[in-house]
């Protein structure tokens, strides 16, 4: 139900009196405004359990991928952040949210208008007239309806910005993962080619021994089978490399097969990326606030509270001051003006009806948003704890695999010397070569897993997600304490 004053065309004193009454009512209702927003809090521990006794120390490491020490990867990430369509789409969503915020009405509004008309009848000259209208409205907002509406719109801007950060982080993770896997695939291909050369040498040696009646036909057949086995795997290794190169091109915003346009040589078999971060790393748990998904969940809780504020405000009367001024000009210099000014009171619906149900629904959404925020935080803590454990485990495994390769290489050298002195069989030599080949494959796998766990750890922390911040505290190092 709405009760509004008629258009006032009385002396200005009466309009001023009504305005004073409206102002008094507004001031009387102003005490009902809600308090300031309190963000949700989580009892973060000083650090993660997987970090042990390491002292948490922050490092400026927003570009954490640079710590893999590979300039090609750095260039690929830069290409992806400039050319990937997902970033463009996310930035467009920010623009949409900002436009929606700008379109949200304010407490004070002006609505100008103008018109020109030409009227006449048969046998008479047309009469031209012009009008200029100016409307004015001022909403007294003691219950914060308009304020809550703008807060919700502003919160959606922050959500869109955090979603852009999430898209940026996902893109960096995908590019780093694809690059680590590419170098691993190239390393595996190189190892298979080296093993193929070794098996050919062994086969030639076996045939020489067979001619000297120092080897059997069975040993030749086994050597040929081992060579055929490794040759069968080579096409799969090469296909895996091409697939990763195509993935990298698409992540950089280009069609598959156009990776050469990026200005980097991905066919060159560079070494596998090796992170320069100690496995004994200390990380403060509240660093998780950097994660875009946590920021999104917190802002959605903020929006839910703002929506609840709007629903609550709808239960109470809305008082506004409205006014219009209309000026009409006729041909011949004649003109006239009309104006109106006064309060308008909009009463709420009957309590206990749809408006109250809307409040109940909004309150339930606040509870839901808070629960989602808490669940997001708990999930983030779990992910970082497991990422820390995985990084520590893969670092230890990679170090052990280096030792294994060194020892198996020494064993192969000794076996060759003993074999040359006829104190070892051909089978012993083949076994020693196979053991070294397996150890080198394991080392390549461990290095790839360590590189991937480094990527996972930083992305689980939300590192590198803020594209506009020059320095984001992310990676950490141990200090003696």
Model segments located where?
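Terminal intrinsically disordered/low-complexity segments used for targeting and assembly
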Residues: 2-10, 16-82, 238-289, 458-481
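Small/polar-residue-enriched beta-strand and adjacent coil segments characteristic
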Residues: 34-35, 63, 71-72, 76, ...
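Mid-chain, structured segments of secreted extracytoplasmic proteins
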Residues: 81-101
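Heptad-repeat amphipathic alpha-helical coiled-coil interaction surface used
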Residues: 94-96, 101-103, 118, 150-152, ...
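Periplasmic alpha-helical coiled-coil/stalk elements that build and connect Gram-negative outer-membrane
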Residues: 146, 162-283, 390, 394, ...
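A short glycine-centered flexible hinge/capping loop motif at secondary-structure junctions
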Residues: 210-214, 419-423, 460-464
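Short histidine
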Residues: 425-437, 467-475
């Amino acid at each position: 139900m709405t009760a509004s004053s008629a258009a006032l065309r009385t002396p200005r004193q009466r309009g001023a009196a009504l305005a004073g009454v409206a102002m008094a009512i507004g001031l009387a209702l102003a005490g009902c405004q809600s308090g300031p927003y309190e963000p949700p809090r989580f009892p973060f521990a000083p650090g993660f359990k997987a970090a042990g006794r390491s002292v948490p120390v922050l490092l400026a490491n927003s570009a954490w991928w640079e710590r893999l020490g590979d300039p090609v990867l750095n260039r690929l990430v830069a290409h992806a952040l400039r050319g990937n369509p997902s970033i463009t789409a996310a930035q467009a969503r920010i623009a949409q949210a900002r436009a929606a915020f700008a379109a949200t009405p304010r407490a004070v509004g002006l609505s100008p208008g103008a018109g020109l008309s030409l009227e006449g009848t048969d046998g008479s000259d047309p009469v031209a007239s012009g009008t200029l209208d100016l409307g004015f409205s001022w909403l007294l907002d003691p219950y914060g309806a308009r304020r809550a509406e703008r807060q919700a719109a502003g919160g959606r801007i922050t959500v869109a910005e955090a979603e852009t950060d999430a898209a940026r982080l996902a893109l960096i993770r995908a590019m780093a993962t694809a690059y680590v896997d590419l170098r691993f695939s190239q390393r595996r291909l190189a190892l298979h080619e080296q093993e193929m050369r070794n098996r050919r040498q062994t086969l030639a040696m076996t045939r020489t021994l067979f001619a000297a009646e120092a080897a059997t036909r069975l040993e030749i057949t086994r050597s040929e089978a081992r060579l055929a086995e490794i040759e069968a795997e080579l096409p799969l290794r090469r296909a895996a490399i091409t697939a990763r190169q195509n993935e990298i091109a698409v992540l950089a915003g280009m069609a598959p097969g156009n990776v050469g346009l990026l200005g980097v040589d991905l066919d060159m078999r560079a070494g596998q990326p090796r992170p320069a971060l100690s496995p004994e790393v200390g990380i403060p748990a509240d660093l998780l606030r950097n994660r875009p998904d946590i920021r999104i969940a917190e802002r959605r809780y903020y929006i839910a509270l703002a929506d609840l504020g709007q629903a609550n405000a709808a239960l109470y009367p809305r008082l506004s001051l409205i006014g219009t001024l209309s000026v009409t000009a006729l041909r011949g210099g004649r003109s006239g003006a009309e104006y109106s000014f006064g309060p308008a009171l909009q009463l709420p619906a009957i309590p206990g009806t749809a408006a109250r149900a809307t409040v109940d629904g909004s309150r339930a959404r606040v509870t839901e948003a808070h629960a989602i925020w808490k669940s997001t935080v708990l999930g983030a803590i779990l992910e970082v704890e497991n990422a820390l454990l995985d990084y520590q485990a893969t670092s230890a495994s990679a170090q052990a695999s280096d030792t294994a390769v060194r020892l198996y290489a020494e064993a192969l050298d000794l076996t060759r010397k003993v074999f040359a002195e006829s104190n070892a069989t051909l089978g012993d030599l083949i076994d020693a070569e196979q053991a070294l080949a397996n150890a080198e494959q394991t080392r390549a796998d461990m290095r790839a897993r360590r590189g991937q766990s480094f990527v996972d750890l930083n992305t689980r922390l939300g590192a590198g997600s803020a594209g506009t911040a020059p320095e984001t505290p992310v990676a950490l190092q141990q200090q003696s304490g």
